[in-house]
Amino acid sequence: MHKTEAQTYLLYDRTLLLLTMGLVGIGLVMVISTSMPIGVRLSEDPFYFARRYAFYLGLAVVLSLVTLGIPMASWQRGSSLILLITLIMLLLVLIAGQSVNGAVRWLALGPWRIQPAELSKLALFCYLASYLVRKAEEVRTNFWGFCKPIGVMVLLAILLLAQPDLGTVLVLFITTLAMLFLAEAKIWQFLPIIGTGILAVMLLIIAKPYRRRRVTSFLNPWDDPFGRGYQLTNSLIAFGRGELWGQGLGNSIQKFEYLTEAHTDFICSILGEELGYFGVLLALLMVFLVAFRAMSIGRKALAINQIFSGFLACSIGIWFSFQTMVNVGAAAGMLPTKGLTLPFISYGGSSMLIMLTAIVLLIRIDFETRLAKLQAFVR
């Protein structure tokens, strides 16, 4: 068999796997670098957060090996159950959740915490993909069929906003609309939903003083650099110090608790300070290449009528792209802060578990697509 023929029969996406491994490697290095100061302050252990990150990474790898063996047909059949479990977990958060910085988003399992909001993304997208398998024609021809998945998203949004978690709600909203667009819903159906969504976001911002402060500080952070603009000004200072090539790995000053949440929501700022604009550009290029591979895998699955797999893969690509744009946009002062992680790079156990599960689903979808083509060729 010639080399080109051997590549044709490769039954997994090697590019996707290598990109993911690269991003996880960058994430591990940056979490070690950014979390040392806060680790020393909280536990007198500079590697406290690095150890936890490594634990979650190991757990994610084990979970991924299990997930890889589950056929996509099983995910389709279990999508409603996954959504139901997610709804129950979100309710439990409101009843017995742990509060951090005024937000109740975590369930405690001994010394570990899980964030059901992260699971809500994958659960909703699995459910929507399953819904589109059954009701694609109804979505295209009937406004009620279009509104049903929006209703499910709104139910999740209500529970998430009670935590509160507007950032996750925006990810769910944008990705849901994008999936319906890919399902060829009529443009006029989107107009009232988008209008209502914009109005709802404006009202939510007005209703909470801390959200208003985020918007005003985003518009002019230098007006109050030691008050409501403190976080953003320090983020911009980090980018400014990094310039093109950065100060060198480990040489950030802003991570010494000038910039809070340096290892989570604002890790991109420290990445820019230590590795420069070049380092940020490389990391973003890798994330968007992962998203592009997801969309490509989805397109190929749809082409051979694997509808559930195709829509799920596309939703993962849209999710990663939008979340990355919001995270980097907030760190660079182009968007108000939303509390979303930078995929695979920010510290966050629940985020790591869910996003690596999503990657494994992409690999499984691609495997089934390639296998179906190979079997058709053999026949």
UniProtKB/Swiss-Prot annotation:
Residues 1-15, 74-79, 134-139, 184-186, 291-301, 364-379 are cytoplasmic. It catalyses: [GlcNAc-(1->4)-Mur2Ac(oyl-L-Ala-gamma-D-Glu-L-Lys-D-Ala-D-Ala)](n)-di-trans,octa-cis-undecaprenyl diphosphate + beta-D-GlcNAc-(1->4)-Mur2Ac(oyl-L-Ala-gamma-D-Glu-L-Lys-D-Ala-D-Ala)-di-trans,octa-cis-undecaprenyl diphosphate = [GlcNAc-(1->4)-Mur2Ac(oyl-L-Ala-gamma-D-Glu-L-Lys-D-Ala-D-Ala)](n+1)-di-trans,octa-cis-undecaprenyl diphosphate + di-trans,octa-cis-undecaprenyl diphosphate + H(+). Keywords: Cell cycle, Cell division, Cell inner membrane, Cell membrane, Cell shape, Cell wall biogenesis/degradation, Glycosyltransferase, Membrane, Peptidoglycan synthesis, Transferase, Transmembrane, Transmembrane helix. GO terms for biological process: cell wall organization; FtsZ-dependent cytokinesis; peptidoglycan biosynthetic process; regulation of cell shape. Pathway: Cell wall biogenesis; peptidoglycan biosynthesis. Peptidoglycan polymerase that is essential for cell division. This is Probable peptidoglycan glycosyltransferase FtsW. It comes from Moranella endobia (strain PCIT).
